[in-house]
Amino acid sequence: MANFDHIEVHVKDIQKYIEFLKIIFEGGENKKLSDEGTSMFKSPEGLFIEIKKINSNNMPQLAGFCQPCLRKTNAKQFIEDNNLELLNDAESPNGKIYFFKDHEGIMWHLKDYQDRDWTNNW
């Protein structure tokens, strides 16, 4: 059995991204791991995200996340309140899903409900 350890994100501004993660997760803490600024963020629920500086704009496979997804009630209001770029929305059996970009141009989506979907509730 494998156990989840952490996800990694490569961004232009590490400290600004830590502050963004604290907004999106409504809290959290972080530790600097290296002199280059590499840091580890820990969400209130214990999700670890390692944040590194992008080495090259020519390497998109080493940049950003691939559409992180969170569940949050009042998702659209949260996106608007934090001046995030709303891209579009979709319907699911449980409710609305909102797609947005953060300040680094990384696309996220927020499910506007708390119950897990059939895709990850097993």
Go through each PLM region and give its residues:
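Vicinal oxygen chelate
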Residues: 3-12, 31, 41-42, 57-122, ...
